[in-house]
Amino acid sequence: MKIRLLKPLLIVGVLLMIWQMVATLGSFPHYIFPSPQAVRQQLFTHAELLWQHTQVTLLEICLGLLLGFLFGLISALLLSFSRQISAVLLPILVISQAIPVFAIAPLLVLWFGYGMASKIVMSVLIIYFPVTAACYDGLRNTPQAWLDLAKTFNISPLRLLLKVRLPAALPAFASGLRIAVSVAPIGAVVGEWVGSSEGLGYLMIHANARMQVDLMFAALLILVSISLCLYFSIDWLLHRFIWSV
């Protein structure tokens, strides 16, 4: 356990050393590439401001993650339950991916406003298709021996889905959840970049416009920390409390 904790701390320490060396030896102006000390000072000086924007972004990420995974899981269940539904819904899902989600970010702000709703929708759209694909793939690849055994009991398609396909697809669901956790922050922050008045993405744009690059780095550092904490927390929960995948 101690070794597992030591490795990430060692990696962080090495990255901080490289950052400090580049900032010191690279002769970059402080307003182009701030040192770790300057960023740390901003973290303490603007702690209240950073916490205020962090709460907004964290809520957007969590709601987008929850809704995106839920919609993706429901869609995968519908696709696997009925061939008729799959024949109609699957082409629509594939065609929808031809439209870059980032390209419609301004439209989402126009439709849903500058508040939290447009950022949550952005996160949901980014999460939805990868989660649907991962969960659907898991539901389709049920071991044939399980299916053959289920047929001997003449169970209904619904019971086959719930009792056989669903348990067999649990590792795929875990993979889908990990994907969702990885990409959820992207949607929230891109939405804040396009149009917002709060959140870490907004704070980064605001600080960049005023050449407060050290504050922008502080916001970025918090965002990276949130992403890593969410991912490793979900990964630990999946291994510790649910199943080992």
Swiss-Prot record:
Pfam family, one: BPD_transp_1
Similarity comment: Belongs to the binding-protein-dependent transport system permease family. CysTW subfamily.
Entry GO CC: plasma membrane
Cellular localisation: Cell inner membrane
Name of the protein described by the UniProt record: Probable ABC transporter permease protein HI_0355
Keywords from the named record: Cell inner membrane, Cell membrane, Membrane, Transmembrane, Transmembrane helix, Transport
InterPro entries, per the entry: MetI-like, MetI-like_sf
Major location (coarse): membrane
Described function: Probably part of a binding-protein-dependent transport system. Probably responsible for the translocation of the substrate across the membrane.
Membrane topology: Multi-pass membrane protein
ABC transmembrane type-1 domain span: 50-234
Highest taxon of source: Bacteria
Protein's GO biological process: transmembrane transport
Membrane-crossing segments per the record: 9-29, 61-81, 92-112, 115-135, 170-190, 217-237
